Structures are given as structure tokens and as C-alpha cells.
Curated annotation (Swiss-Prot):
The record marks S484, K485 as: Cleavage. It comes from Tomato spotted wilt virus (TSWV). Disulfide bonds join C114-C145, C122-C156, C224-C285. Tospoviruses are transmitted from plant to plant by thrips as the insect vector. GO terms for biological process: fusion of virus membrane with host endosome membrane; symbiont entry into host cell; symbiont-mediated perturbation of host process; virion attachment to host cell. Residues 1-35 form the signal peptide. It comes from the Viruses. This is Envelopment polyprotein. Residues 177-195 are annotated as: Non-covalent dimerization. Residues 36-314, 485-1067 are lumenal.
Length: 1135
């Protein structure tokens, strides 16, 4: 009976279990389950699939609508198995309930999991200078988040390097590699909003959107004005900004200043240190950039303090040398006297110093007898006098040669008494320390220490809103109309603006004020605008701006930012503010805005020719051709070189100056852009799991994206089941992965098409001032001279067809680089567009690219090892071509400067012979024009173009009041003349007259009126009123070591000018020969003088007496008197 009841119970339990399992299995067949995502990044292995069907040549060609899915607990409860669908970029998500009515909610109304990171599982994926990228998991779903605040993220994984707060200084991305080394102030995560196939849901701060995340290099942004410059000690600059917060810093190109940006509000004063005045640093403040001029602080301080005395200026400037001379004199006289007088009272000091330096003293004393120029019995150094002092090395009272045998140090006897003691004994210590040699050394050390103490105490130097009519406004960043009392964005409109065809009506809510005005809107704006604020934006800003307002909202309006320094339009300003909000809408527009540079930090002084360091040469003409003097000039093709030629003729009165300066020499490369590559900073993964079915079943809910997709099947079998899923050998997990690229470290890959040697040559002097590009392919030619390059073979490591990389440091690299669409395992993957969109990657991931795991009962997990190709780590194998940074021109060419000679520059100058003749009459100058553009009292000066017609060929001097000129002499030819002249003026030369003096003759002078002067005072540090800058420059020019060296060689210019390109070499040879000749004659003169003094010849001469007394007095005056050569004269015949 008991057995039957037991069997009955077993059958009932079995039937109940089967029924329950069937119900659960039937329920789970129609219900999908979500899985947890796990992401691992690092130096992971790549597995390449060379099959054609696994490669995506162009990702941009695969267009797909945006997927906008924000999964919440509400949706998971109410969503049916068929509701995971593809949306067409909509921001409204339908929620299907049991009723027939459809409910819609906004994405922004859904719960924000990113803001609840402290209570959810989260992981920090990347930390930039200005924000953080992290991922949050909720109910098995991973959410990507970017935040400008670190609040609430302390408990997240990998939060050790998370700062307590991020800087709020406004920044925008830098997309041009050439500008990164100049303006980079760190990195920031940006969201690229797009409708391409590679987007995914992201939340920036509290604003959900769709797009991709990338890490970009950033620069400062904002309105900043340099209001004052005081380049006298202290060297300060005052800056102001109308924005609530602004950033500035001092940056040297290429320097890492990621965490050195200083924020300020209102105004700030910057004091430059001496290191910042080296001419290599720039001041970056918002949109503005200013080059800090090279200033010798020591020279400038002395010039300012002693501006009325050149002698005091010289003493102050060279005080660093004078103070050393003063210390040397102090050591040699009073300090030495003091040390000699206190040797006995300070015996403990000398014993202490001797104890510290005992090994050195022992070594010197023992090796003293092997030293040259020494006195063996005294131990003193004898170079000049060759005389020994009276004190012996072993402290004998008098010096004697016998002392050498008695002194243990100099003695050669082996059985000396001191040999019984060790070198470390007290006997040897007293002997060594008290020798004359040791004692002199200890006193010298004491003198140096006292001198250093005195030296340390000596001074180092001697010396936009949009208005309806009156009180109703649109403020960027606020979607409602506000009044003039606007403080923060309200929840609804505070006023009303009605734009009609012929008038505009404005009314302020809560008041009885209604204002009417004429319709003065922007014309030809054809777009629909229904709400009041849309009508106002269309009226004042246009349809393009309205489209941005509707589709690209501003989360932070930055109402104080105007973008005036960059000259931004209303649309450009809106886009710049979007960039400040961390959103990139268009790469091309971002590249345009970030490429705008306000200031002179990238400018170079194009007209500056360092004449003070250039050698001078008298130029002799080679021949006369068609009435012209032909000069053949040949110079080494080396950047920074040049020569000042002085042209002269017997018939001319003054020499003509002709300057050739080779500004730079290098190779111009034409290239073809291939792609951009960058490291993978992190990875975003999304996948979906089904209990039954296969990949096709899974893809109905998780559609293919076109690249980097994956699917694993089967995923349901014994030992690998989720709760309430009992399927066997069924199920699938499908999804996709997307990379977050670090564009801050991106490289652009180019293919070399052509290389040409190019020289930038500047000509100044009688031909005016001009700089020209001369290539090895086409000679340069104008009316007066021809230039040609004779190039040597150059091997710079770059060949035609080779792939090169342009790095974020603006340097060029070569090596093993993968070609476009080539999956070879070399540097060059991932392959991207400029804005970080993949253009070649894997279509589907293979099993080796990821790992899949599950539990007996639980959710499945996937680990992504490699999301596409990644070989960026092979960049260490690249070789840097040059130490000089390069700039690309329209991504099609660049110039690589060389620091060595690339050949010869040959110039043929044909000057009319009339230039060397005195003008017979006053020349007729007609059709004159002199137009200038530039700044006053600045380093750039006024760039002027002088044009006129002349009836004569002549040479003329030029001058103008209150201005100094880049050249003071011009070669005028008959007919049309045009010259480029730079003028540095202290006052506006407009409507003044420039005077021409033919052959320097004021009697036949001609005046040319200055027609037009456009003064553009740039707002930077260099172009401020600085009355001492010219004095400093003049002093530096006059005191240049190169200028002094050239002055010494100048007497030999005439002879050396006959040797052409060997001009400078011949001058050095002649100078050395002259020095040896002078030394030879001086040695002869010295020998004669020594003999004269030694023989006392000055005592052998006396006043010549009468002939009658000479015989008597001669023996008393001279020794060895010579006999007379003729007898005395006989006068007897006269008697």
C-alpha cells in the first residue's frame, strides 16, 4: 500500500514538472533576453582575415538610418518580443500598451542612467584633460556616457586617476595637425552627431543623443583682449575678457602644457620670466595668440635705466663679466692678504679642509716630482720666474738641493723613517698637509670659498544676443524668448515677438507694453517658422541659423562669447558654441573654425634680413654686355646664408648695396593623402541574445550594421542556459562593436608623388626688397637678374611612391606603413577619415577576435579582444626624417627644410651702365604711386609698393621724415619701375613726401607723395609702443660677435672679391697671413729692443762735440772707439 502511494506521488510530481517546464519553455520561446557586455582593451593580438568577403573597402558607402534606442525598466516591462526595431533618427519612441492607444515619450524624459553612476555598476574608460568617458551597466545593458564633472564617479572601476574636478575653461578641437604643436592645451572627449551606420546612443552630461565618441586635441576658445603692454621691468601684459571664465597660458611650440592652463575672470596681469623672453614662447588667451618678442632682459634693463649714458649702458650690459673680474681682483689682493695674515689662528680650519681633501693632497705630493715646470727641492710650480721660494716642501727653513734627499716625499731611499708608517697614519697626515704645495692649495680653496660667498651676495644686474525690437531677446542656449532682465533660461517665453510682412510687434508678458516697428528682417529667407522664437531667429539670423537652432540645440549658450577675434558669422558662432559644448556636427566646419588663428604666433618676419651678420664683399663686374655691367655671383645653397655686395665704378660717386639672403633651403614634396590612423582609446559594444533560433533569428531584432558585426550560435545547451531557458543547441548572440579613437595622437598617411629642391631667396638693396621661390626645375628671371639652382644629389630617405606619416608633433616619419585597403600587419591600422570614421575594417568579427562565456544558469557575456584591425603600436618602428617641423598645404604638399648645403645658387645680375654715371639733369618722375599697409611702432612695419615712370636710368638715394627704410638706395631704370619697400615709422606717413636724391645730389632731388596708408595695429605683444626696442636692437647689431669678426676681415674685401665663391675663405687666409706677419715683425722688434737694453746702447751715445775736443773727450765717452777713416784737414795753405 505504501509503495503504491509512493508511486502515485512520483507520477504526480513528474506530470507537474513536465507541465511547468512546458509552460516556461513556451513562454521563453517568445521572450528575448538581454545579455551583459564586458569590454577589455589593451595590447591585444590581432587576427587578420584576408578573405575578400570580410573586408569593407568604404564604410561611408554603407548608409543606414540611425538607431535610437534608450532602454529603460519601463520599456523592458512593456516591450513585446518584436519591439526591438530600427528607428529612422526619431527622438520620440512609441511604447505599446495593452490598450489600442499609442503613448509617446521624449528621450530626454526617460530615466538617465549616466547620472545614477554612483548606484550602478560603472567603469571609467578614459580620462581627458577636460572631461571623462565612462560606461554604466543597468539590467544587463551598457550605456556610454561623457561628463564634464567627476562628481558621483568615485566608486567606479579605474577611478584612481580621476581628478576631483575638471577645468571649465572653454575649448574647441584642433583638427589641423600643423597647429597642434602650437596651440594644444590638452585633450577632450567629443561626440560626433551623425546619421551614419557607426553611431550609437550616448549621453553627454545629462543630454542623450546619437553619435560616436572620439578623443580630440583642443585649444582655448573665447574673447580675450590684450589691453596693455609694459616691456620695462617688470615685463607684464594685461588681458581682459567679457566671459565668466577664460583661460590663458604661456606655451612653447611642442611643449606639453596639458595641466598648465590658468583660468581667470574679468582681467588678469601676466608677468613674463626671463625664460619666456627667448622669442620661442607664445601667449595663448582664448581665441587670441601673441608671440612674445625675444628680449634680452639684462640688456633691456640697462638701456632703460641708463638711457642717457652709453658708458653706463655698456657697463650694465656687461656687468656679468665685470662682476667676475671684480671677484678675481678681490681674491687676488684683499682676500689673499687676509688669508695670509690668518693662517696661524685658523690652523683648525686648514686641518679640517686638509682632512677632507687628504687623498687629493697625498696624490699631488707623491706625483709632484714627475710634474714638469717644478722645483724639485721646493715643490712649487715654476713657469715664468723659474725661481724657488725660500721654504722647502718639507718645511726646511732654507731651500737647498740637499733637502731633496732628506724629504721623504722626494727621497729615493727605501729605508727612510717614514716608510715604517702607513699612508693613513698621523705622521704622514701632518707631513702631507704641512708641505708648501698642500698649504698653498688649501689657502687657494679658502680664497675661492670666500670669493663665492661674496659673489652670491652681489646683484645680478645693474639696472551676442538677438533683439526683437526693444526688450525681447533670443539668447543662444535658451529655447525661449527672454526679457532684458534675463539671468537664467526660464521654463517658458517671457515675451512675444510677432513678425509680419510689414511690421514687427513686440509684447512683454505681465505688462501692458506693446511696441510696433518696421520689418527690417534679413531679406530672401524662405523657410517655415511658426513659433514666436523661430520667427525672431529667421528674421534676425536667417534660415541657416534657424535650421541649426531646431536640429542642433545648444546645451550651454555661452552668451558672453562673440567670436569677434575670429570674425565669425552668426552661424559660425553657433557652431563654435556647439564645439564648446563638446558636440562636433561637421568635420569640415570644425576644421574651418579651429583653423582660424587670431594673432601673430604663427607669423614670421618675412622682411627681416640680418645684414649685421652677413659678410660684405666688393663686387667686380665680369663683362659689359649690351651696355650693361654683368656680375656673376655664386653662393652655397645653404639656409641662413647670404652676402652684402658693394657695387662701384670709377665714374660713380657712391657705392651701391646689393644684398642676397637665402632665407631657407629645402625640398618641396607633392603628396597624395591616403588615410588617417589613430590608437583605439576604448570600445563600445552592443549585442542581443535569443534563447532559441539562430543568427537569422537574432538579426531580426539586432540588424546588421555593415561592419564589425558578430554572431555566435548556438548559445543554449546543457550547462549553458539562462534562467527559464531550456533550449538545446539553439540560440544566438549577435551585435556589433565600435571603437573610440584617440585623434589627439593621430597620424596622416601620404604617398610621395614628386620632390623638388626649393630655395627662398630675398633680394634687397638697389632693386628694392623682394623674396622669391627658386626651384631646381625652372630658373627665376626678371628684368635685372637671373637665378638658377645647381642641385647636388640629395638622399633624405624619402623616395617617390613611398608612404610617409605626418605625426601630431608635425614631424615626418617613414618606415613600414600599410597601404590603403591592405590588411598587412604593419603600422597604419585602423584606417580612418579625418573625423575618425573607419574606411577600411573587418566586415564581421571572427572567433579569435572575441571570447564568449556563460554560466550554468545566468546571463551570457562576451569579451571583445579586437574590434577591427589595430597596428598603431608599431609606430615605434617608424623613423623621424627631420628635426624641423613641417606644415602641409591643402593636404597636397609640404616643405621640408634642410640644414645642410644642397648645391649652388648662381645669380647673373645685369645692371645698366648708366647707374654708375652721374645724372646729367633732374629726372622726370611721373605716374607716381606709393601705397603702404601695416602698423606703426612695431616690428612688422609698413609694407609699401612704390611705382613710377622715369625718363632716365640712374641710381638714387631715398628718404622720408620720421621713418627708417629697409633700403636707402634704388636702381631706377628708364620706363616703368616697381619696388617693395618696408618702412618703420614713428608717425603716420600719409600724405607726406618721399625724396629721391639721384646719385646723392640734393640739387636735382625729386619728391614722391605717399598716396595711401592703411594702418592696422595688430593686437599683440610685439606691436605695442616700445621706445626702447630700437635701442636694444641697435645695441645687439653693433655688439654682435659676427659683426665684429666681419669688421676685422673687411680690409681684405677688395682682394678677395676677385676669387668669387671663395670670397670669405680668401679673407680668412689673408687675415691669418697678416697676423703671422705682424707677429714676425713684432718678434724682430722685440729682439732688437732686448739687445738694445741688454747692451746698454742708450748709454753709448752723447752729444757730438767740436772736432778739436773730440780726440780728447772720445776716450772718456766711449769704449773701443773706431779710428778715423781720413786724416785731419790741413789749412796751412790758407795762411
Amino acid at each position: 500500500m505504501r509503495i503504491l502511494k509512493l508511486l502515485e506521488l512520483v507520477v504526480k510530481v513528474s506530470l507537474f514538472t513536465i507541465a511547468l517546464s512546458s509552460v516556461l519553455l513556451a513562454f521563453l520561446i517568445f521572450r528575448a533576453t538581454d545579455a551583459k557586455v564586458e569590454i577589455i582593451r589593451g595590447d591585444h593580438p590581432e587576427v587578420y582575415d584576408d578573405s575578400a568577403e570580410n573586408e569593407v573597402p568604404t564604410a561611408a558607402s554603407i548608409q543606414r538610418k540611425a538607431i535610437l534606442e534608450t532602454l529603460t525598466n519601463l520599456m523592458l516591462e512593456s516591450q513585446t518580443p518584436g519591439t526591438r526595431q530600427i528607428r529612422e533618427g526619431e527622438s520620440i519612441i512609441p511604447i505599446f500598451a495593452e490598450s489600442n492607444t499609442q503613448k509617446t515619450i521624449s528621450v530626454s524624459d526617460l530615466p538617465n542612467n549616466c547620472l545614477n553612476a554612483s548606484s550602478l555598476k560603472c567603469e571609467i574608460k578614459g580620462v581627458s584633460t577636460y572631461n571623462v568617458y565612462y560606461q554604466v551597466e543597468n539590467n544587463g545593458v551598457i550605456y556610454s556616457c561623457v561628463s564634464d564633472s567627476a562628481e558621483g564617479l568615485e566608486k567606479c572601476d579605474n577611478s584612481l586617476n580621476l581628478p576631483k574636478r575638471f577645468s571649465k575653461v572653454p575649448v574647441i578641437p584642433i583638427t589641423k595637425l600643423d597647429n597642434k604643436r602650437h596651440f594644444s592645451v590638452g585633450t577632450k572627449f567629443f561626440i560626433s552627431e551623425s546619421l551614419t551606420q557607426d553611431n550609437y546612443p550616448i549621453t553627454y552630461n545629462s543630454y542623450p543623443t546619437n553619435g560616436t565618441v572620439s578623443l580630440q586635441t583642443v585649444k582655448l576658445s573665447g574673447d580675450c583682449k590684450i589691453t596693455k603692454s609694459n616691456f620695462a621691468n617688470p615685463y607684464t601684459v594685461s588681458i581682459t575678457s567679457p566671459e565668466k571664465i577664460m583661460g590663458y597660458l604661456i606655451k612653447k611650440p611642442g611643449e606639453n602644457v596639458e595641466h598648465k592652463v590658468i583660468s581667470f575672470s574679468g582681467s588678469a596681469s601676466i608677468t613674463f620670466t626671463e625664460e619666456m623672453l627667448d622669442g620661442e614662447h607664445n601667449l595663448l588667451c582664448g581665441d587670441k595668440s601673441a608671440k612674445i618678442p625675444k628680449t634680452n632682459k639684462r640688456v633691456r634693463d640697462c638701456i632703460i635705466k641708463y638711457s642717457k649714458s652709453i658708458y653706463k649702458q655698456t657697463a650694465g650690459i656687461n656687468f656679468s663679466w665685470i662682476r667676475l673680474i671684480l671677484i678675481a681682483l678681490l681674491i687676488y689682493f684683499p682676500i689673499r692678504w687676509l688669508v695670509n695674515k690668518t693662517t696661524k689662528p685658523l690652523f683648525l680650519w686648514y686641518d679640517l679642509i686638509g682632512l677632507i681633501t687628504y687623498p687629493i693632497l697625498l696624490l699631488i705630493n707623491c706625483l709632484w716630482k714627475y710634474f714638469p715646470f717644478k722645483c724639485s727641492n721646493c715643490g712649487n710650480l715654476c713657469i715664468i720666474t723659474h725661481e724657488c721660494t725660500k721654504i722647502c716642501i718639507c718645511n726646511k727653513s732654507k731651500a737647498s738641493k740637499e733637502h731633496s734627499s732628506e724629504c721623504p716625499i722626494l727621497s729615493k731611499e727605501t729605508d727612510h723613517g717614514y716608510n715604517k708608517h702607513k699612508w693613513t697614519s698621523m705622521e704622514w697626515f701632518h707631513l702631507i698637509v704641512n708641505t708648501k704645495l698642500s698649504f698653498s692649495l688649501l689657502k687657494f680653496v679658502t680664497e675661492i670659498l670666500i670669493g663665492l660667498i661674496i659673489l652670491s651676495q652681489m646683484p645680478m644686474s645693474m639696472a551676442q544676443t538677438t533683439q526683437c525690437l526693444s526688450g525681447c531677446f533670443y539668447v543662444p542656449g535658451c529655447p525661449f524668448l527672454v526679457t532684458s532682465k534675463f539671468e537664467k533660461c526660464p521654463e517658458k517665453d517671457q515675451c512675444y515677438c510677432n513678425v509680419k510682412e510689414d511690421k514687427i510687434i513686440e509684447s512683454i508678458f505681465g505688462t501692458n507694453i506693446v511696441i510696433e516697428g518696421p520689418n527690417d528682417c534679413i531679406e530672401n529667407q524662405n523657410c517655415a517658422a511658426h513659433p514666436s522664437i523661430d520667427n525672431l531667429i529667421k528674421c534676425r539670423l536667417g534660415c541657416e541659423y534657424l535650421d541649426l537652432f531646431r536640429n542642433k540645440p545648444l546645451y550651454n549658450g555661452f552668451s558672453d562669447y562673440t567670436g569677434s577675434s575670429l570674425g565669425l558669422t552668426s552661424v559660425g558662432l553657433y557652431e563654435a558654441k556647439r564645439l564648446r559644448n563638446g558636440i562636433i556636427d561637421s568635420y569640415n566646419r570644425t576644421d574651418k573654425i579651429s583653423g582660424m588663428i587670431a594673432g601673430d604666433s604663427l607669423n614670421k618676419n618675412e622682411t627681416s634680413i640680418p645684414e649685421n651678420i652677413l659678410p660684405r664683399q666688393s663686387l667686380i663686374f665680369d663683362s659689359v654686355v649690351d651696355g650693361k655691367y654683368r656680375y656673376m655671383i655664386e653662393q652655397s645653397l645653404l639656409g641662413g646664408g647670404g652676402t652684402i655686395f658693394m657695387l662701384n665704378d670709377k665714374t660713380s660717386e657712391t657705392a651701391k648695396k646689393f644684398v642676397i639672403y637665402i632665407k631657407s633651403v629645402g625640398i618641396h614634396y607633392e603628396v597624395s593623402e591616403k588615410y588617417t590612423t589613430a590608437p583605439i582609446q576604448s570600445t563600445h559594444t552592443d549585442f542581443y541574445s535569443t534563447c532559441t533560433g539562430n543568427c537569422d533569428t537574432c538579426r531580426k531584432n539586432q540588424a546588421l550594421t555593415g561592419f564589425q558585426d558578430f554572431c555566435i550560435t548556438p548559445t543554449s545547451y546543457w550547462g549553458c542556459e539562462e534562467a527559464w531557458c531550456f533550449a538545446i543547441n539553439e540560440g544566438a548572440t549577435c551585435g556589433f562593436c565600435r571603437n573610440i579613437y584617440d585623434m589627439d595622437k593621430s597620424y596622416r598617411i601620404y604617398s610621395v608623388l614628386k620632390s623638388t629642391i626649393v630655395a627662398d631667396v630675398c633680394i634687397s638693396g638697389i632693386l628694392g626688397g623682394q623674396c622669391s621661390k627658386i626651384t631646381e626645375e625652372v630658373p627665376y628671371e626678371n628684368a635685372l637678374f637671373q637665378a638658377d639652382i645647381q642641385a647636388d644629389l640629395h638622399n633624405d630617405g624619402i623616395t617617390i611612391g613611398e608612404l610617409i606619416a605626418h605625426g601630431p608633433d608635425s614631424h615626418i616619419y617613414s618606415g613600414n606603413i600599410a597601404n590603403l585597403n591592405d590588411p598587412v600587419k604593419m603600422f597604419g591600422h585602423p584606417q580612418l577619415t579625418h573625423d575618425g570614421v573607419p574606411i577600411f575594417t573587418k566586415k564581421t568579427l571572427e572567433g579569435d577576435d572575441m571570447s564568449w562565456d556563460c554560466a550554468a544558469i545566468g546571463k551570457k557575456s562576451i569579451t571583445i579582444k579586437t574590434c577591427g584591425y589595430d597596428t598603431y603600436r608599431f609606430r615605434s618602428g617608424l623613423e623621424q626624417i627631420s628635426d624641423i617641423p613641417v606644415s602641409f598645404k591643402d593636404f597636397s604638399s609640404f616643405f621640408l627644410e634642410k640644414a645642410f648645403s644642397l648645391g649652388k645658387l648662381k645669380i647673373v645680375v645685369d645692371l645698366p651702365s648708366d647707374l654708375f654715371k652721374v645724372a646729367p639733369k633732374r629726372p622726370s618722375i611721373t605716374s607716381t604711386s606709393l601705397n603702404c599697409n601695416g602698423c606703426l611702432l612695431c616690428g612688422q612695419g609698413l609694407s609699401c609698393i612704390l611705382e613710377f615712370f622715369s625718363d632716365l636710368t640712374f641710381s638714387t638715394a631715398i628718404s622720408i621724415d620720421a621713418c627708417s627704410l629697409s633700403t636707402y638706395q634704388l636702381a631706377v631704370k628708364k620706363g616703368s619701375n616697381k619696388y617693395n619697400i618696408t618702412m618703420f615709422c614713428s608717425a603716420n606717413p600719409d600724405k607726406k613726401k618721399m625724396t629721391l636724391y639721384p646719385e646723392g645730389n640734393p640739387d636735382i632731388s625729386v619728391e614722391v607723395l605717399v598716396n595711401n596708408v592703411i594702418v592696422e595695429e595688430p593686437e599683440n605683444i610685439i606691436d605695442q609702443n616700445d621706445e626702447y626696442a630700437h635701442e636694444e636692437q641697435q645695441y645687439n647689431s653693433d655688439s654682435s660677435a659676427w659683426g665684429f669678426w666681419d669688421y676685422i676681415k673687411s680690409p681684405f674685401n677688395f682682394i678677395a672679391s676677385y676669387f668669387g665663391s671663395f670670397f670669405d675663405t680668401i679673407r680668412v687666409i689673408l687675415l691669418i697671413a697678416f697676423i703671422f706677419l705682424v707677429i714676425y715683425f713684432c718678434s724682430i722688434l722685440t729682439t732688437i729692443c732686448k739687445g738694445y737694453v741688454k747692451n746698454e746702447s742708450y748709454k753709448s751715445r752723447s752729444k757730438i762735440e767740436d772736432d778739436d775736443d773730440s780726440e780728447i773727450k772720445a776716450p772718456m765717452l766711449m769704449k773701443d772707439t773706431m779710428t778715423r777713416r781720413r786724416p785731419p784737414m790741413d789749412f796751412s795753405h790758407l795762411v
